Amino acid sequence: MSLPVEDVRDYPRPPALEPAGARVVVRLGGAVAAESDRALRVLETHHAPTYYLPPEDVAAELIPCPGLTFCEWKGRAEYFDVRAGAGRARRAAWRYPRPSPRFRALANHLSFYAGEMDACEVGGVRVLPQPGDFYGGWLTPNLVGTVKGGPGTEGW
């Protein structure tokens, strides 16, 4: 599948929530940890899209981790270690159990840090993790524009 060109500068703020429109696959430890044709994605100015899969499409074992974070748009997130096949990734997935009303459709959907998985794909296209160690977006080759997260971009 060929993904359409998207300019991250055109993504909205506050962020938007929409169907991913493509099959999303997460691999870990030689196994498919999650796979969905019903994934959602969050789009925000200068960010790579963040993909969220329905819990029933996640085959991996999720082990709760201590600590929470708060997003001004989506609410409080909780984190999980992920175990699939022969692999285990620490604090590699998160969800919003009770998101803000605008993002209600995300409730309990799981997102994965691409850099902690063996591979993540959107529409058969392998992704790269969003730069930095904070954001969980997935970079695909169809994205143009500067993506926040790398050195010197944290403050804008």
Language-model features, listed with the residues they occupy:
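Terminal leader/tail segments of proteins
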Residues: M1-W156
